[in-house]
């Protein structure tokens, strides 16, 4: 039985990851701010497994992660670290973002270093994001990310900048200390392929809300652009596949479909508008002009942060390493487009009724993009 130390375990990706890890022969140590709150989250979903789930109170922003002496001793027996912690908040301030991502990376690396020197860390898995500019070749640069990072990486948005600098820092430290590192770069994450339920509304949800209000009359960038997506259950399965591997050094996995096979932004908005019974935008606006509009007050009207447009991209990404693990047809088989209308409907509802609560007594399932709520029982 291997011991996994997981950050972000109560988050949108983390809860799904715990569900997948539960199928393995593991003991999971979850870093949480509040043990009682975390237990309640998993109890409500019927997924609390006390036999192999252990909640450890701490904080990414604190030295030694704020662990008690007893908890630190337990964590030092870890075989694999999965670092998926940090909020999805593109509007975070520089101070907030640096505290969570940069300081968090520093503190968890100190832990990884101690484990590796004590017993040998089998693997460090870091979940970052597909827009990170760093990979296995260009990350071999000797800069102090805390002192020189902001000047080196000229990205205005603090959330993106600090998250990517944290990626660079962990890569630097893994190389220096010698622990195996897997960096997983998912695109924008939506809900499970089984339900479409997307609790994380800060990403795609902002686009859905803008369209619902009739504030997205144009196609940002045009047909050459796209918004890559992945479901949280398929992402979790991929992370577990990487967890099973013996990782010798440092490997990056970018989970973005080949551009020629992916939906472009015009097609995505068309499906979205049809799902919401809204008129689809027809006119394309060049991305530089679109960003200028957003920076000049358009963000206040559409409620989409100007920096949110950076996730709509015309870039091509290398996904060879991901295909090597999952097979050449993995992206096609797991395409979000198969259930995208259900994701849009879920986000539309959540954005309109933000105080609503999901009753976890009912099991939610999809059938041909129709959502069913079932109550388990005997009849």
Regions found by a protein language model. Give the residues of each.
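N-terminal Rossmann NAD(P)H-binding glycine-rich loop of SDR-like oxidoreductase domains
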Residues: 4-25
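Glycine-rich phosphate-binding loop and adjoining beta1-alpha1-beta2 segment
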Residues: 29-52, 60, 66
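NAD(P)H-binding glycine-rich loop region in Rossmannoid oxidoreductase-like domains
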Residues: 49, 53-104
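Conserved Rossmann-fold NAD(P)-dependent oxidoreductase catalytic core, especially the SDR/UDP-sugar
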Residues: 83, 91, 103-158, 182
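NAD(P)-dependent short-chain dehydrogenase/reductase
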Residues: 140, 172-226, 232-234
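Active-site Tyr-X1-5-Lys
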Residues: 153-182
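Conserved C-terminal active-site "lid" loop/helix of NAD(P)H-dependent oxidoreductases
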Residues: 232, 267, 291-329
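Mid/C-terminal beta-alpha module of Rossmann-like enzyme folds, strongest
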Residues: 238-305, 335, 340-379
